Amino acid sequence: MKYFVVLFLVLFNYNVVGQIKVDNVGDGWVDKVNQAITLIKKVDSEKYDKLIEVCDHVTFWNGNFSTSENDHTIMISQSDILRGSVNNVAAVLVHESRHLMFRKLGIKMSEIDEETMAYIYELDFLQKIPGVEPFLIENARKRIVNPK
């Protein structure tokens, strides 16, 4: 019975999509992440497989930008969620999964080179989304040229 209670508490605080646990912080954020993960799976199964391979936890924070933490967690910024775009959240997940993949493989490079590679990966994904918001494509292209 004790194990059942622990399992219940863990599942109560997380929403699990495939193998990724998404922290439940309310305000529809979990739904937005779930929609983004579904979009990635539909649009680019290879990037979805990589995401599932390297990420097992999505959380949120109040920072100005999304990032990754340790070797398996993607932290989505409040500002990225509040933009209201599922495509943007999907782009964040794809972008940050690239950073996690580099860590997993032990690939070391300069921060600027790593950001450039992550934006190239993100842009490749964005260009496959029918009707994607132009500002997302423009931002990725701009960041490839000037990653900072």
Explain the meaning of each model-derived region.
Residues 3-12:
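Sec-dependent N-terminal signal peptides
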Residues 76-93:
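Short pre-active-site segment immediately N-terminal to the catalytic Zn-binding motif
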Residues 84, 106-109, 131:
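Surface-exposed, polar/charged faces of alpha-helical domains
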Residues 91-104:
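Active-site recognition of the HExxH zinc-binding catalytic motif
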Residues 111-146:
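Post-HExxH zinc-binding segment in Zn-dependent metallohydrolases
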Residues 17-73, 81-82:
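Auxiliary, metal-adjacent structural segments of Zn-dependent hydrolase domains
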Residues 32-35, 88, 92, 113, ...:
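Extracytoplasmic/secreted proteins, especially bacterial periplasmic and envelope-associated proteins
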